A protein has these predicted regions:
Chain A
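N-terminal acidic leader/helix
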Residues: 1-27
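Amphipathic, hydrophobic secondary-structure cores in small proteins
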Residues: 17-65
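C-terminal structural segments of small proteins and small subunits
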Residues: 55, 60-82
Length: 82, 972
């Protein structure tokens, strides 16, 4: 479908971001991805990503899943404050 | 009321350390060595008569009017071609000289329309000089042969050439050569038969002339004259302002009769353009008074209703009330705004302030999202500041110039003229572009290397170039050791075999040997400069590529002085400014993240409103959220998303899903079809404020007339905010800039007063740089050390396949501008009345397509129809089109893929198929799951906007998606 909601964007965008950090270890990449999402993604996008990852983790690269865990652990308070 | 007339010194300045002392008519004057007598005299306040000389051109010495006598020298040398020597004494008004001048003028007038002798056109130097030399009669009588019956050439829509008035001084020819660099004119014939010839003795319109107007400006008679000047007569006042087209930001004198613009003359002291311009800025300003201009606010409850003109009070109250209702029901995060890169800094600043303080959200973005947002990300990450490093004049010191993903002769023509001048002087050129742009080979210019890469492989190429630099020992080790960090990690990464030119060749299609040669040329040049455009940024790795270029520049020490650098050719007149003003969901003005509590406190204190600490939605996220139902109201200032943003069907579906779409613009555009409120905006001729160009140069925009809408745009924003309960108070635009300066360290020293004093200011302008900053990162990077980033090449997800085997890339053309809202409403349609599809002859032949045939251009998201133009400028497998005409709808086929860091759309890489179209009239069809409906543009159609909204919103699966494509009056 040419038109689409945010959810489809989130999967595509998150996976795309994760593929940019192949030059570091997966752990480091997850940290970088988490930072990027926290710095540039609006809270409903982060929340949508976390919800989708919890429900359908197979849609995401492993680095994205690791990044969502870091997001919740390190930035969770800030996200919840929105 | 006065006309601004810049002094013409007759010949160019010759800056240099040595000085000579001369005396002209008894006045002592010191000038740099090499200065002409003419210029020295002008410096001393003495104007020597001249016709063939002007200080934008090299001296020519043909008219013989400027002859003088020099003590101790024989004869009467031309003062324009004679340099001063130390101790020289010059006489400019001896009896002998006056006699010679009078004789020369008499000869000129012997073959010149007699009416010029007693009256003349505006600024006719020949007429003025006749008075100066005291010429009152021509004794030659009517010669047997003359040029008085010479035909006029009125082919150009903007200026006329009357050969009868031409004195063959060659100023026009030299202006076309030296200033513009097109070489479209010559002097044909010899002796009495000499005549100005365009092209191969063709009408101007049929020749290579690009209608920049440099010849018109250079002409000392009325031979070349603007048609508006002929029609309206001479102006009587000038207003200095700035062009509203591209990111060059040319300064102009708007020359007026009352409130009527007669002509726009490039301002010689304009920092960006120094007296030059292009066809758009100089001539295509008529859109400001076009009949399509909307001057009254309009509202409607639904987009199916006709528009209703209302008062400003009603429109503002309606807008404010609706935003408040939506926010109350769905939360402040359900509303937001988009600012324009065509509006002033002051206007943009206030819209983002309204969104943050009155709406209570960071859901504000700007059109830089779809063009140079990767520049902001990439240069901030590597250098520490989201802007280019140089000014335009810097190119004059470059020894090697790299142009990547840009076509400056079309997109930034005045800067291109500077670049071409440097190339003609011997600088080398490397072009990295899938298309053979004009710069690859044009008069007196040929690229040393054209790396004709496949679309989507920029990072592979730049990494391969950097690989050469590192592995062949071409790094400027002293520079990187002193000024940069993370060098070793980056060098180890880039040296890997997979980054070599040989490994990348199958991916990029660039021969390894060619790439190695180009890399060596760049790395070994004393000064090497990179200029780039949207062919870099509008990719899935746009930000990565910007960082890759920054890596290359740092690795070779090409940062921090003139002649080097990394310079984005920013598209719009104020896209730099709209970014500077914090019109981003994650940043406040000066590129400071909203999460920084110190910055938020600064704004909150001055604004009296809290700033949200989390980033807001970007434009693509706003649209997707609208389809989800979580984003429901939008304020769109001067942007036409429905034409300019990718995947048109997605955009229009999102707009239709919203409860409130407010459009502030000059004309009803594609986006306005989906709007509930239309607030008429002001053109640049009515605005009072500033634009910031690609050089970080803040220029004044001064009004030549009152707003035809009755209000300045910023006043409307202030009133909407007030109606929503947030009050702002400014007496004028200068006070808005004062607030910007108070809050933004890079603007701290900027004020309207200082801009009037200095003419323009390049930020940063603060205590450390009170007059602004020409070149960035001179002694150190803004972030401290330059940061090397490992830029792994990741192929785009957009792939060709059997169904879509070609790659589409898009771009601009000289005569039209962006979505064409302005230029389509001028005579520039003469040159580009429609978008066409450039296709390689071999691709066309395989498909049975001939030049001029209608073709269907289809991608996985949509299809459109346009005419084919066979061209070898692209390699086989790549097609190209522009996006200036809504009827073509080029963005119907572009996809949702975007830059990983910024969501800048990947306009430059779309997998498509091209097939002969079964019809002879243009069609736009959106791809649908089960059935398709063709809608003929211009034909009566039973499908209305209501049909679109009913079928387009909500339902998934089978539905007919028929889109009204004709820009019919929605008020009908």
């Amino acid at each position: 479908m040419p038109k689409h909601g945010l959810d489809r964007d989130l999967v595509r965008m998150a996976n795309q971001i994760s593929r940019q950090f192949t030059y570091v270890s997966d752990d480091e990449a997850a940290v970088k991805v988490a930072y990027h999402l926290h710095a540039f993604w609006e809270p409903r996008m982060v929340a949508g990503l976390e919800a989708h990852a919890a429900e359908r983790p197979a849609d995401f690269e492993p680095i994205v899943l690791a990044a969502t865990r870091i997001l919740a652990e390190q930035y969770g308070e800030a996200s919840a404050a929105h | 009321m006065t006309l601004i007339r810049e002094q013409d010194f007759g010949t160019k300045a010759r800056p240099g350390p040595a000085t000579v002392h001369v005396q002209v008519d008894g006045r002592n004057v010191d000038v740099p060595e090499g200065t002409s007598i003419m210029r020295a005299a002008a410096t001393a306040g003495i104007d020597i008569p001249k016709l063939c000389a002007t200080d934008s051109l090299d001296a020519f010495g043909s008219c013989r009017l400027c002859v003088v006598e020099v003590d101790g020298r024989r004869g009467t040398p031309a003062s324009c071609t004679t340099p001063c020597s130390d101790g020289m004494s010059v006489k400019t008004q001896t009896e002998k000289v006056q006699r010679l001048r009078s004789g020369v003028m008499e000869l000129y007038f012997s073959d010149h329309p007699q009416d010029c002798l007693s009256g003349g056109g505006h600024g006719c130097e020949l007429h003025d000089l006749a008075d100066t030399v005291g010429l009152t009669e021509v004794r030659y009588g009517q010669p047997e042969t003359s040029h008085q019956d010479a035909a006029k050439d009125v082919s150009n829509p903007y200026f006329a050439f009357d050969a009868a008035k031409c004195i063959v001084c060659s100023r026009c020819v030299r202006a076309c050569d030296e200033v513009q660099g097109t070489f479209a004119l010559t002097i044909a014939g010899r002796g009495f038969d000499s005549r100005v010839s365009a092209g191969q003795d063709q009408p101007f319109l049929d020749s290579e002339c690009v209608s920049c107007g440099a010849c018109v400006q250079a002409c000392p008679t009325d031979a070349l004259q603007e048609k508006t000047l002929i029609q309206l007569g001479p102006p009587n006042r000038s207003v200095l302002t700035t062009c509203a087209y591209c990111g060059v930001g040319c300064s102009f004198k708007a020359e007026m009769q009352g409130d009527t613009v007669v002509n726009m003359v490039p301002y010689k002291n304009g920092g960006a353009n120094e007296g030059h311009s292009c066809v758009k800025g100089r001539f295509a300003w008529g859109y400001a008074s076009h009949k399509d201009r909307i001057t009254k606010p309009m509202v409607r409850d639904t987009i199916e209703d006709p528009w209703r003109e209302v008062s400003w009070d009603e429109a503002i109250a309606y807008t404010a009330t609706r935003f408040q209702q939506i926010a109350a029901q769905y939360g402040a995060s359900a509303i937001g705004g988009i600012t324009s890169s065509r509006c002033t800094n002051e206007e943009v600043y206030l819209v983002q302030k309204m969104v943050r303080a009155a709406f209570g959200t960071n859901n504000v973005d700007t059109c830089a999202r779809v063009c140079h947002s990767p520049t902001g990300y990439g240069l901030k990450t590597t250098f520490g500041t989201s802007a280019g490093t140089q000014d335009f004049a810097s190119v004059a010191k470059a020894d090697v110039i790299v142009v990547i993903g840009a076509n400056p002769t079309d997109g930034h023509p005045v800067f291109a003229s500077r670049m071409k001048r440097r190339l003609r002087q011997g600088a080398k050129l490397i072009v990295i572009d899938p298309r053979r742009i004009d710069l690859v080979r044009s008069p007196h210019i040929e690229a040393s290397h054209h790396l004709q890469l496949l679309p989507g492989t920029n990072v592979a190429v730049i990494n391969a170039m950097a690989h050469v630099v590192v592995t062949e020992g071409l790094m400027d080790q002293a520079f990187v050791d002193e000024r940069c960090e993370d060098v070793a990690e980056w060098a180890a990464f880039i040296a890997r075999p997979e980054n070599s030119p040989e490994a990348m060749e199958p991916i990029t299609s660039v021969p390894a040997a060619e790439l190695r040669a180009a890399a060596r040329l760049y790395a070994t040049a004393p000064n090497a400069a990179i200029y780039y455009g949207l062919g870099v940024t509008e990719h899935s790795q746009g930000s990565t590529m910007v960082m890759g270029m920054a890596n290359l520049a740092m690795a070779t020490g090409n940062i921090g002085r003139e002649g080097v650098g990394v310079s984005p050719l920013r598209g719009q007149n104020n896209v730099q400014g709209s970014c500077d003003m914090g019109s981003f969901p994650h940043e406040l003005s000066g590129y400071r993240h909203v999460s920084d509590p110190t910055v938020r406190e600064l704004f909150a204190d001055l604004w009296g409103a809290p700033i949200h600490p989390e980033p807001g939605l970007r434009i693509p996220n706003m649209l997707s959220s609208a389809i989800d139902g979580t984003f429901r109201g939008i304020y769109i200032q001067g942007e036409d998303l429905a034409q300019s943003d990718p995947n048109t069907q997605h955009v229009t579906a999102a707009l239709m899903a919203m409860d409130l779409v407010v459009v502030q613009d000059l004309f009803l555009n594609e986006t306005a079809k989906y709007a509930h409120v239309f607030l008429p905006g002001t053109s640049f001729l009515e605005k009072d404020g500033t634009f910031t160009n690609a050089e970080r140069r803040i220029n004044r925009v001064r009004p030549v007339m009152k707003p035809v809408t009755g209000k300045q745009e910023w006043e409307v924003v202030v009133e909407i905010s007030a109606a929503m309960g947030y009050h702002m108070a400014y007496a004028n635009e200068s006070e808005i800039m004062d607030e910007i300066a108070a809050l933004t360290p890079t603007f701290a020293g900027v004020s309207f007063k200082k801009l009037d004093e200095l003419g323009s200011i390049q930020w940063p302008c603060n205590d450390a740089a009170p007059n602004g900053t020409r070149t960035m990162h001179v002694d150190g990077f803004v972030r401290g050390k330059g940061h090397f980033v490992e830029t792994a090449y990741v192929p785009t997800d957009e792939r060709t396949n059997r169904k879509f085997p070609l790659l589409l890339t898009t771009g601009r053309i000289l005569s039209q501008y962006n979505v064409g809202a302005q230029t389509r409403r001028t005579k520039n349609n003469t040159w580009h009345p429609e978008d066409v599809l450039d296709i390689h002859p071999s691709d066309a032949e395989m498909r049975g397509i001939h030049d001029g045939d209608w073709v269907s251009l289809a991608s996985r998201v949509g299809e459109t129809t346009l005419k084919a133009k066979l061209s070898e400028r692209m390699p086989p497998g790549v097609v190209y089109t522009t996006f200036h005409h809504p009827v073509t709808g080029a963005n119907v086929v572009t996809t949702e893929f975007s830059d990983w860091a910024t969501n800048c759309p990947e306009y430059k890489v779309t997998a498509v198929q091209v097939t002969p179209a079964p019809t002879t009239r243009p069609l736009i069809m959106h791809q649908v799951p089960l059935e398709s409906t063709l809608v003929e543009v211009g034909a009566a159609s039973a499908i209305s906007a209501s049909g679109v909204s009913a079928s387009g919103a909500g339902a998934s699966g089978a539905h007919a998606s028929a889109v009204r494509t004709e820009a019919a009056d929605p008020r009908a």
